[in-house]
Amino acid sequence: MQDPKVVIALDFDVKKDALDFVDRIDPSQCRLKVGKEMFTYFGPEFVRTLVAKEFDVFLDLKFHDIPNTVAKACIAAADLGVWMVNVHASGGEDMMIRAREGLAQFGQDKPHLIAVTVLTSMDKRQLSQIGIQSSPMEHVLTLASLTKQAGLDGVVCSAQEAAMLKETLGKEFMLVTPGIRPQGSDVGDQKRIMTPQEAMQVGVDYMVIGRPITQAKDPVAALDAINVSIA
């Protein structure tokens, strides 16, 4: 597969379980996401192991700090050989620009740099509680527009915002979407969800899928079924 669209969220708290799972999966059929829990448990060496197994790794640590600190963190991620790294758009334009500039030294090998807009667990009530009166959709557009202005590759967003973002910010602006659940899956803690087929139809570039694959009785078959459904 030339450009796998499925990014499997590796949410394991035992390294052996994670590696056993990874060894069953073909790196040409998917990419892998390592988030805060696994990175805290297993550290950067685990990421290097995945890269050595020829997986494209999305390091999902959502950096959000002063510009210099975030730039250095992104450089450290690139040194691990990751395919993609992200920051919080709410950290501001200067922070995002510094992150992008920090990665320029890696040339063609630099990872994709994307920004988180509104977490998929957030709804209008929760946004209001932190002082944001706009709807999730409006706030996503504000932060995504700022991200494009800063020169980043794209954003993490919910599938419901994808069509609007592609129309407003252009087809080249990359959309990475969690909250994707194959038909019949448990929705878990994601409030804004969509099936893989629906996500592709509205312009999602890469879909993050965790438990429907990692907790399936046959993870390889589950991944294959998703890939077939979006081919």
UniProtKB/Swiss-Prot annotation:
This protein's record includes keyword Lyase: yes
Q: Name one GO molecular function term.
A: orotidine-5'-phosphate decarboxylase activity
Record keyword Lyase present: yes
This entry's Enzyme Commission designation comes to 4.1.1.23
Q: Subunit comment for this entry? A: Homodimer.
Kindly give the CDD domains that the UniProt entry links to this protein.
OMP_decarboxylase_like (cd04725)
Q: What is this protein called?
A: Orotidine 5'-phosphate decarboxylase
This protein's gene is called pyrF
Give the CC-aspect GO terms.
cytosol
Role of this protein: Catalyzes the decarboxylation of orotidine 5'-monophosphate (OMP) to uridine 5'-monophosphate (UMP).
Query: Could you mention a single GO BP entry for this protein?
Result: 'de novo' pyrimidine nucleobase biosynthetic process
Similarity-based family: Belongs to the OMP decarboxylase family. Type 1 subfamily.
Q: Spell out the disulfide connections.
A: none
Q: List the catalytic activities from the record.
A: orotidine 5'-phosphate + H(+) = UMP + CO2
- Give the residues the record marks as binding substrate: 11, 33, 60-69, 120, 181, 190, 210-211
The pathway this protein participates in, as annotated, is:
Pyrimidine metabolism; UMP biosynthesis via de novo pathway; UMP from orotate: step 2/2
Q: Which UniProt keywords apply?
A: Decarboxylase, Lyase, Pyrimidine biosynthesis
The active site annotation covers 62
